[in-house]
Design a protein with these regions (language model features):
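Bacterial N-terminal signal peptides that target proteins for export
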Residues: 1-13
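N-terminal signal peptide c-region/cleavage motif recognized by signal peptidases
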Residues: 17-21
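N-terminal (or domain-start) structured segment
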Residues: 23-116
């Protein structure tokens, strides 16, 4: 299990690297959806929920974990692609989602051009 100080440190790092919202609009003004491509209880799921909980407390808004498993990460990735790029749908993922388009030509997205990474949460 990941210790609380590590999660807090990683969350602080994530907040430091997050872009500042432009204009007078308050962010977040509604719950943030956190897409997770693995089933509940997996390492990616646990990390996503811990980071979401800490960010929710700091930002004063809830993070809703949305597990979209299957399709070798494609179900979650397609949900992210279809979502507006407004910062209210985020995805926590493993390197698998970024490698899929290079392994299967049927996947029509570019992980470098189509997505904006926010933070590196954990390394092994």
């Amino acid at each position: 299990m990941v210790s609380v100080p590590i999660v807090r440190w990683l969350t602080a790092l994530l907040l430091t690297l997050a872009p500042v919202a432009a204009g007078a609009q308050d962010y977040p003004s509604r719950p943030i959806r956190l897409l997770i491509h693995t089933p509940p209880g997996s390492l990616v799921d646990v990390l996503g929920r811990l980071v979401g909980q800490e960010l929710g407390q700091r930002l004063g808004q809830s993070f809703v974990a949305d597990n979209r498993t299957g399709g070798a990460t494609m179900i979650a990735v397609e949900q992210l692609i279809r979502s507006p790029a407004d910062g209210y749908t985020l995805m926590i993922t493993s390197p698998e989602a970024t490698m899929q388009p290079f392994l299967k030509k049927s996947y029509q997205y570019d992980p470098i051009k189509d997505f904006t990474p926010i933070a590196l949460v954990v390394t092994s």
